[in-house]
């Protein structure tokens, strides 16, 4: 039965996942509903799939098809009937790269982002799609245009290339911002924005979310 136990830390290192085929339809329906009600993407803790709905019926799901040594390999599926039926639309959205899905987000039926983090948490790559997930391309940020680094960068002897972890884009009107940090959990780094849905990115300064230091 289901027990209320705290997930052991090693779960992060060697994820055990249950293939979707073995999970009940009720469970799947429940997860889809949670994803529909969620503002962002929803991660199924049982099987590691990541689901996102742009509206009630139209959604996407990254499903784990293989896993090894803390990394997963995903395919991308789409529903147009609110999660009742799913169609595989992309067998390899991350172009052969394994990792842990960081997020999945669409802004209309065609334009969206997906993120794939390395198991160590030291790097993450954001991918963009303009055709509803049929193909993705990696976002390239112009690191050499960073004219300042975050407040503690000099103490840590960081250069721009030390910021390898791209956080999922934040939307503000027609502008999307990617914060770039040194590793998962860091509260400061540098950021880049795009006004053309991720085709070109511009350096937008350093940031620190550690309270009022240097703000």
Language model feature labels by segment:
Residues 45-51, 97-104, 147-168, 211-214:
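Repeated scaffold domains used in trafficking and secretory/extracellular systems
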Residues 39-66:
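Beta-strand-rich domains and repeat architectures in extracellular enzymes and scaffolds
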């Amino acid at each position: 039965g289901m027990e209320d136990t705290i997930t052991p830390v090693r779960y992060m290192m060697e994820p055990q996942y249950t293939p979707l085929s073995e999970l009940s339809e009720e469970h799947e329906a429940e997860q889809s509903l949670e994803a529909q009600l969620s503002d962002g993407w929803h991660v199924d803790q049982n099987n590691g799939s990541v689901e996102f709905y742009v509206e009630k019926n139209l959604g996407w799901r990254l499903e784990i098809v293989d896993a090894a040594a803390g990394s997963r390999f995903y395919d991308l599926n789409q529903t147009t009937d609110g999660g009742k039926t799913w169609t595989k639309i992309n067998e390899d959205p991350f172009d052969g790269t394994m990792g842990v899905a960081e997020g999945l987000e669409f802004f209309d039926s065609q334009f969206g982002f997906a993120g794939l983090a390395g198991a160590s948490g030291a790097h993450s790559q954001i991918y963009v799609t303009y055709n509803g997930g049929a193909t993705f391309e990696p976002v390239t940020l112009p690191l050499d245009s960073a004219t300042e680094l975050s407040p503690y960068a000099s103490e840590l002897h960081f250069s721009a290339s030390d910021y390898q972890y791209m956080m999922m884009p934040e939307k503000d009107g027609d502008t999307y911002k990617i914060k770039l940090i040194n590793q998962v959990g860091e509260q400061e780094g540098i950021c880049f924005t795009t006004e053309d849905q991720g085709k070109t990115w511009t350096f937008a300064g350093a940031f620190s979310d550690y309270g009022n230091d240097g703000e």
